[in-house]
Amino acid sequence: MLSKIQSLGCRGVTGYAVSVECHVSNGLPGFDIVGLPDAAVKEARERVRSAIKTNGMKFPVSRLTVNLAPADTRKAGTLYDLPVLLGILCATGEIRQPPATAAFLGEVSLAGEVRPVTGALTMALAAEQIGLKELYVPAGNAAEAAFADHVTVYPVENIAQLVHHLRGDRRIAPKTAPRLETEPRFPVDFAEVKAQENVKRALEVAAAGGHNILLIGPPGAGKSMLAKRLPTILPAMNRAEMIETTQVYSVLGLTTPDDPVVRTRPFRAPHHTVSNVAMSGGGSALQPGEMSLADNGVLFLDELPEFSPAVLETMRQPLEDGSITISRATGSVTYPSRFMLVCAMNPCKCGWYGHPSGRCRCSPRDVRRYHARVSGPLLDRIDIITEVPSLHFDELRSTTVPESSAVVKQRVETARAIQRERFKGTSCRCNANMQTPELRRFCELDETGALLMQQAFESLGLTARSYDRIRRVARTIADLAGSESILPEHLSEAIQYRTHQLIQN
């Protein structure tokens, strides 16, 4: 007898349909799974056999063949345990064939419990696109999968519960999507940072336009402290961003039933010893790396020159495209990587170059060699470069209360609202994403601005990419000021962020 159970597969953040075909025939007892299964899929034979017997049902003593179609696509993971088990029960007449619009996925324990799998949200979204109406998933994945709008998600705790449901004895209650918390709470605040008003202004501009930023200053100046507070002024994630980022985290199994969706913008801060694979992703399973885990959030690289040159150069393409494609002999996977790059570094190897105390002992050649660890093409992709000076004692003792993150965030959200209206109907999300058509339309300079830009271009030796990035930053500064056009003062501030000695070297 032949049965067919609908299931799903997941490769990266892309889901696809998989049909699990089970055939029971006369012959010597055997249990074969075909259709390019990996080791975990092949091991399903023992898990399924034990689960069926443990729950008081008969396992066929005959020839049993399971095909995972399409047979030319490699199948990986334990998510096919549940559809294989149901296919066997249907083929032996234990239960009726489920409707073709229902899909099943989940790992099965020897006792028949249904355990969570990775990539549940991606497969739920794929089920929605395919046109499936019902999705049966492990209870631990149900809250995550329920964010697919037009699919009814049923949480399954064990196979006995599912069998009773399919027989019509006791129905499983569908899972509803949990309520999203719109205002994230942070344990840190900009109000905790004394002085550094110029740096805070640069971070506000970066947050308002989604610009990449580099902080340069001596040890103890507060570079890391300021960078870690950047997420507190970023606008809240919308539903589409939450789902996109959650898909990446789900691939690694980083979601939980209590926290099924990524609600706050990620802040990833890998150590400077991070490997190329850990940063960009890869491995035998083609898993996402730090750049993808920072999607719709912040990727913070402290001690930038200490990172491997290969790691830094890998970032150039994702910074431009907002995605990264990992290719191996087994295939290729594309992950989103729309992140804000925030970097911090000392001005020289010892960290005290240019400090009023005169503590630096680095020669000009040493300073240039240290700066050269950050390549020109990577610097070209950083919109804002600003110095973080050491604080004076009177600044530390000041009783003036700095602006809170909530106040700064209001200005940032106002500027982002202007950008959403401006880019309605386009692929741009913020000013940092503007391409040539948008730059021509929204970043036109008047005669005074054009002359100022020409002087800066010639005196600073700017590239065409730097020219475009200055105009993007100027557009953001104008948005923060509520100006429809880019004025000379907006352009001057944007140019100021490209005049650091690091660029000149």
Regions found by a protein language model. Name each.
Residues 296, 302-303, 314:
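Walker B catalytic acidic pair
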Residues 215-256:
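Walker A/P-loop
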Residues 34, 40-45, 60, 67-77, ...:
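Basic, amphipathic alpha-helical bundle interface domains used for macromolecular binding and assembly
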Residues 59-62, 98-99, 129-131, 149, ...:
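Short loop/turn elements that form and flank the Walker-type P-loop nucleotide-binding site
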Residues 239-275, 282-283, 389, 429-437, ...:
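Conserved inter-motif catalytic segment of the P-loop NTP-binding fold
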Residues 1-214, 218-224, 327, 467, ...:
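Peripheral, non-AAA+ core regions of ATP-driven protein-machinery
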Residues 204, 261-266, 276-299, 331-332:
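Conserved alpha-helical scaffold flanking the Walker A/P-loop in AAA+ ATPase domains
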Residues 111, 301-308, 351:
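Catalytic P-loop NTPase motifs of RecA-like helicase/translocase cores
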